[in-house]
Amino acid sequence: MLVLVGLAGAGAAVGALSRYGIMRLALPLNRWPLPIATLFINLTGALLLGWILTSSLPPNWQIFLGTGIMGGYTTFSTMINELVLLGRNHHQRVAWEYFGLSLVGGLVMVYLGTLI
């Protein structure tokens, strides 16, 4: 059990560092109200998670990659915070578009990931 916790924790660190790197690279895109970086991260994470969960990888690898890396990489809380900020800054239409793209796009990406 401790090994599994260690695998998930190590993976989460890798995922969080990857997310941080992408967020930093996307800083020039901040001139648009749509949070492109978080949307990209969550959609690519959903695609990869779909693949991981239906792959024939050993359980330890699924925990490291799925629970760990994808858990640290994707970010529901940042998405919710960005939705609130969009609403507060009078970008309600963009907030609804972002919500729809995140929800429907995430489901589509998970499905596509299962086909890989």
Swiss-Prot record:
Domain of life per record: Bacteria
GO molecular function: fluoride channel activity; metal ion binding
Binding site for Na(+): 71, 74
Reactions catalysed according to its record: fluoride(in) = fluoride(out)
Localization, UniProt: Cell membrane
Positions of transmembrane segments: 2-22, 33-53, 63-83, 96-116
UniProt keyword annotations, A-Z: Cell membrane, Ion channel, Ion transport, Membrane, Metal-binding, Sodium, Transmembrane, Transmembrane helix, Transport
Pfam family, one: CRCB
Modes of activity regulation: Na(+) is not transported, but it plays an essential structural role and its presence is essential for fluoride channel function.
Recorded topology in the membrane: Multi-pass membrane protein
Cellular component aspect of the GO annotation: plasma membrane
InterPro entries, sorted: FluC
GO biological process, one term: cellular detoxification of fluoride
Physiological role: Fluoride-specific ion channel. Important for reducing fluoride concentration in the cell, thus reducing its toxicity.
UniProt similarity note: Belongs to the fluoride channel Fluc/FEX (TC 1.A.43) family.
Protein's name according to its UniProt entry: Fluoride-specific ion channel FluC 1
